[in-house]
C-alpha cells in the first residue's frame, strides 16, 4: 500500500482501522441480539474486504463518516467508566485480532481468501422500498452475504481459535443473520490486517488506552467539522 493521504497521520489511520474492527464487533453484537443492523454501517464494515486494488486507507474506507459507530465504540471500550458495558464487543474485537495472526501464519489460507474475494463485487446501499428493483437488489445482497459467510466457514472457521458469539438463539439460528455475522467477522479480520500493516500491535492496546480513546474522539471531531 502506498502512503496514505494527508488528512490524517499514520497513528490516526491506525486507529481508523481499529475503529473499523470495533464497528464490526459492535454490529455482530447488535445482530445477535436484535437480528438487524443499519445498512450503511454494515456496508462500511464489509466493503473493505472487497477493495482489492487500494492505494490508501481512504480507498479502503471511502466514507469515513460511516465508521462513526466504530470510533465511538473505541472511545467507550477504552473508557474506565464504560468499558465494562462493552465486554462482548471488546472480546469480539480482540478475537478478530487473534484470528488475523492465525491467518497470517497460513499462506495457503490467505491465497484461498484472496482468490475467492476477487470474484465478489462490493455491496451497494439499497433503498429498502417494496418495488421490484429493490427486492432484486436485496436478494443480490443476501447472495453476497452468503458467499462471504461460506468463505468464512471454509477458511477462518478451520483455525484453532473460534469467536463465540452471544445473543438470542432465534437470531443466531437464522441463516440470514448468521451469514451477516460471519461476514462482519471476516470484514473485521480484513481491517485487522490493515491495522497491523499500519503498525498496530495488541500490547499497545494495553499501554496506550488513553491515547487511543483520545485519538478516536479527535478523529470524530475532524470528520464532522470538515463535512
Language model segments and positions:
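Short, solvent-exposed segments of well-ordered alpha helices
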Residues: 5-19, 58, 79-83, 87-90, ...
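A structural signal for well-ordered alpha-helices, especially hydrophobic packing surfaces
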Residues: 22-25, 29-32, 100-107, 121-124, ...
Amino acid at each position: 500500500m502506498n502512503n496514505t493521504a494527508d488528512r490524517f497521520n499514520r497513528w490516526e489511520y491506525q486507529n481508523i482501522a481499529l475503529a473499523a474492527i470495533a464497528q464490526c464487533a459492535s454490529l455482530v453484537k447488535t445482530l445477535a441480539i436484535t437480528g438487524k443492523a443499519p445498512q450503511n454501517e454494515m456496508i462500511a464494515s464489509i466493503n473493505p474486504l472487497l477493495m482489492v486494488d487500494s492505494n490508501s486507507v481512504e480507498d479502503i474506507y471511502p466514507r469515513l463518516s460511516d465508521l462513526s459507530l466504530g470510533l465511538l465504540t473505541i472511545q467507550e471500550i477504552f473508557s474506565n467508566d464504560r468499558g465494562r458495558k462493552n465486554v462482548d464487543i471488546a472480546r469480539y474485537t480482540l478475537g478478530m485480532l487473534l484470528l488475523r495472526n492465525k491467518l497470517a501464519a497460513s499462506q495457503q489460507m490467505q491465497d484461498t481468501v484472496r482468490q475467492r474475494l476477487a470474484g465478489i463485487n462490493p455491496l451497494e446501499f439499497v433503498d429498502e422500498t417494496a418495488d421490484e428493483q429493490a427486492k432484486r437488489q436485496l436478494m443480490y445482497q443476501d447472495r453476497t452475504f452468503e458467499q462471504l459467510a461460506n468463505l468464512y466457514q471454509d477458511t477462518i472457521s478451520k483455525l484453532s481459535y473460534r469467536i463465540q458469539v452471544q445473543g438470542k438463539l432465534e437470531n443466531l439460528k437464522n441463516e440470514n443473520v448468521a451469514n451477516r455475522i460471519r461476514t462482519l467477522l471476516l470484514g473485521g479480520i480484513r481491517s485487522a490486517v490493515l491495522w497491523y500493516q499500519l503498525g498496530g500491535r495488541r500490547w499497545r492496546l494495553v499501554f496506550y488506552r488513553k491515547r487511543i480513546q483520545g485519538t478516536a474522539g479527535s478523529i470524530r471531531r475532524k470528520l464532522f467539522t470538515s463535512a
